[in-house]
């Protein structure tokens, strides 16, 4: 029944600090929920490239309410990486779910968005063990750049001032001799 077609909601859960400190590994969990029918493909992408190593995905989607014939489905997947790889704030992790829904030709009369075939994804950035995120790293670089420009400007101003004083002293000495 076409009115029961729903695309997934996708979320990525970051690794626990306990796992990282005890095993030196980091497991990201992807959860796709609320979709029907169960025609989906889940993939992990790291820094823009699809990865298969360290990936463990449920063999098939599970019914959220097994007693119902037209129950929506859920699917989970895990990506395990080294703690040091996770703790690099430049690393970008994305869980992508390809949902095979309605085609453009299928008639749709419901008062919600038509659940067409689509890609739904969620993402996370590596998180340094000192609390750095990609955003805080970029903010730090920006602050350092501004500070450097201020110090460079002060040094230039100081050099101009000292040069002017030396020039004035030379002119004054020349005037007093001549």
From Swiss-Prot:
Cytoplasmic side: 168-178
Compartments (UniProt record): Cell membrane
CDD domains: IgC1_TCR_beta
One of the GO BP terms on file: T cell receptor signaling pathway
Ranges annotated as spanning the membrane: 145-167
The entry's keywords: Adaptive immunity, Cell membrane, Disulfide bond, Glycoprotein, Immunity, Immunoglobulin domain, Membrane, Receptor, T cell receptor, Transmembrane, Transmembrane helix
Role noted for this protein: Constant region of T cell receptor (TR) beta chain. Alpha-beta T cell receptors are antigen specific receptors which are essential to the immune response and are present on the cell surface of T lymphocytes. Recognize peptide-major histocompatibility (MH) (pMH) complexes that are displayed by antigen presenting cells (APC), a prerequisite for efficient T cell adaptive immunity against pathogens.
SMART domains recorded: IGc1
Segments for region (Connecting peptide): 130-144
Location, primary (coarse class): membrane
Name the record gives this protein: T cell receptor beta constant 2
Organism lineage string: Eukaryota, Metazoa, Chordata, Craniata, Vertebrata
A Pfam family annotated for this UniProt entry: C1-set
Domain Ig-like C1-type: 8-117
rRNA processing keyword on record: no
Positions annotated as glycosylated: 69
Gene Ontology CC entries for this record: alpha-beta T cell receptor complex; plasma membrane
Subunit structure as annotated in this protein's UniProt entry: Alpha-beta TR is a heterodimer composed of an alpha and beta chain; disulfide-linked. The alpha-beta TR is associated with the transmembrane signaling CD3 coreceptor proteins to form the TR-CD3 (TcR or TCR). The assembly of alpha-beta TR heterodimers with CD3 occurs in the endoplasmic reticulum where a single alpha-beta TR heterodimer associates with one CD3D-CD3E heterodimer, one CD3G-CD3E heterodimer and one CD247 homodimer forming a stable octameric structure. CD3D-CD3E and CD3G-CD3E heterodimers preferentially associate with TR alpha and TR beta chains, respectively.
Entry's free-text remark on domains: The connecting peptide (CP) domain is essential for signal transmission in response to antigenic stimulation, likely downstream from ZAP70 recruitment. The TM domain mediates the interaction with the CD3 subunits.
Cysteines paired by S-S bonds: 30-95
């Amino acid at each position: 029944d076409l009115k029961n077609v729903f695309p997934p909601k996708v979320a990525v859960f970051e690794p626990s600090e306990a796992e990282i400190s005890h095993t030196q590994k980091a497991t990201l969990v992807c959860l796709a929920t609320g979709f029907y029918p169960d025609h989906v493909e889940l993939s992990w992408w790291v820094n823009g490239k699809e990865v298969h190593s360290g990936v463990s995905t449920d063999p098939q989607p599970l019914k959220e309410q097994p007693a119902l014939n037209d129950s929506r489905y859920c699917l989970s997947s895990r990506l395990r990486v080294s703690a040091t790889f996770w703790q690099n704030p430049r690393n970008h992790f994305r869980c992508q779910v390809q949902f095979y829904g309605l085609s453009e030709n299928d008639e749709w009369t419901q008062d919600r968005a038509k659940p067409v075939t689509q890609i739904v994804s969620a993402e996370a950035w590596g998180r340094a063990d000192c609390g750095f995120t990609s955003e805080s790293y970029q903010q730090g670089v920006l602050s350092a750049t501004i500070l450097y420009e201020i110090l460079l400007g002060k040094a230039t101003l100081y050099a101009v001032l000292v040069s002017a004083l030396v020039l004035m002293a030379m002119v004054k000495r020349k005037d007093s001799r001549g």
